[in-house]
């Protein structure tokens, strides 16, 4: 029997410790050649919604540890808004605002059978936060105890949980354009972690004095004020270099990416030689359909600068000892450009599936519904 697994099922079994362990093992498997993945690719097509565009995204990967292949697929209508403070963001919905469609399909690498269909929402937020947490574990100062958080949504929540799992965090300062959202985030996170969480009125106020700076936004323009980054800080982003302003790019000594080598690091991290499609997607490859009048609906991601390739380093080099990591307490380091999402969905999906089976959760349905006797 296969399983239909809801977000509620995933939340019952997947804690941050489990997620961090699965992500780290998945990364190491990938770098030593025991797992593989295809980076995220999007397909865009004109929509009947005059203010939006259809966006399909998919990514795949394997996990030898859990014996699974995972594909994560998402189907959205993307649209763009300008929020408080003038920050332009990309929003989305499926069918109607407030609903979303994202699925993880899990298959056995032992016999090929379909194992599960999972809602991706909760797992997605956890795996992104855990990935940043792994980077903090290896690259932030050991005494880092203050976080400057830009963003107050689910990604900002899981990032804070991950940081608290790998460092002794004492304080989080949070900024997002909507005051009630940052106030609620501060109140709820303080209750969850038992630490001081302060809502502040600007990104600069969040960043000042923080040893860990994290941007968790849907913005298509830079949000991190580089001049406010403290010496010795470690910076994480969910959108590669999109969230970094020119000063940030200039002050960061090394920008780590999870791509396996410098040649595989996307030009989208460098801000040069990118196609119209990449400028739309921001951090990954995209194929875009539409005439000029259709394409005019889609604003291009705005970057203020790209990294000199000499600043770009693969996390693989760090784990294998070819890169020293943090060399002193004053240098500013950063991580972004996650190109191994498929590995993460396979490893965290595999760990989650195992726990779901152990606890008897999920809804069973006949595997035969997904099989056929006609050769494809």
Positions of PLM-derived features:
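N-terminal ligand-binding/catalytic initiation module
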Residues: 1-127, 131-133, 143, 343-346, ...
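Adenosine-phosphate binding glycine-rich loop
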Residues: 7-11, 246-376
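Glycine-rich phosphate/pyrophosphate-binding beta-alpha loops
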Residues: 119-124, 237-244, 337-342
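Short helix-loop-beta connector
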Residues: 140-146, 168, 230-231
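Glycine-rich Rossmann-fold phosphate-binding loop(s) that bind the pyrophosphate
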Residues: 152-153
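N-terminal Rossmann-fold NAD(P) dinucleotide-binding loop
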Residues: 156-157
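NAD(P)-binding Rossmann-fold cofactor-contacting core
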Residues: 166-193
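Rossmann-like adenosine-cofactor binding region
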Residues: 194-292
């Amino acid at each position: 029997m296969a399983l239909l697994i809801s977000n509620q099922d995933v939340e019952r079994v997947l804690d941050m410790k489990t997620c961090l362990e699965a992500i780290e093992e998945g990364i190491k498997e990938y770098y030593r050649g025991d797992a593989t993945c295809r980076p995220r690719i999007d397909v865009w097509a004109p929509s009947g919604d005059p203010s939006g565009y259809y966006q399909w995204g998919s990514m795949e990967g394997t996990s030898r540890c859990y014996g699974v292949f995972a594909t994560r697929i998402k189907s959205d209508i993307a649209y763009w808004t300008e929020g408080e403070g003038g920050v332009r963001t990309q929003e989305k919905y499926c069918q109607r605002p407030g609903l979303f469609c994202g699925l993880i399909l899990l298959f056995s690498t032992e016999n090929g059978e379909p194992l599960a269909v999972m809602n991706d929402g909760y797992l997605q937020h956890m795996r992104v936060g855990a990935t940043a947490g792994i980077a903090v574990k290896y690259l932030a100062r050991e005494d880092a105890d203050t976080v400057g958080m830009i963003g107050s949504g689910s990604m900002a929540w899981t990032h804070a949980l991950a940081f608290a799992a790998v460092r002794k965090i004492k304080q989080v300062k949070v900024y997002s354009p909507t005051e009630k959202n940052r106030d609620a985030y501060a109140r709820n996170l303080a209750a969850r972690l038992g630490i001081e969480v302060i809502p502040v009125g600007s990104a600069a106020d969040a960043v000042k004095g923080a040893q860990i700076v994290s941007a968790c936004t849907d913005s298509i323009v830079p949000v991190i004020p580089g001049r406010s980054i403290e010496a010795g800080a470690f910076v994480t982003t969910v959108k590669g270099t999109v969230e970094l302003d020119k000063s940030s790019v200039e002050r960061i000594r090394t920008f780590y990416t999870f791509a396996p080598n410098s040649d595989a690091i996307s030009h989208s991290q460098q801000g040069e030689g990118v196609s119209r499609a990449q400028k739309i997607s921001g951090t990954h490859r995209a194929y875009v359909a539409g005439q000029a009048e259709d394409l005019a609906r889609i604003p291009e991601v705005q970057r203020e600068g790209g990294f000199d390739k000499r600043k770009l380093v693969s996390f693989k080099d760090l784990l294998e000892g070819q890169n020293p990591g943090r060399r002193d307490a004053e240098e500013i380091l950063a991580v972004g450009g996650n190109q191994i999402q498929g590995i993460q969905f396979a490893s965290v999906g595999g760990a989650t599936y195992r726990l779901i089976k152990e606890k008897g959760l999920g809804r069973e349905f006949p595997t035969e519904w997904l099989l056929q006797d006609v050769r494809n």
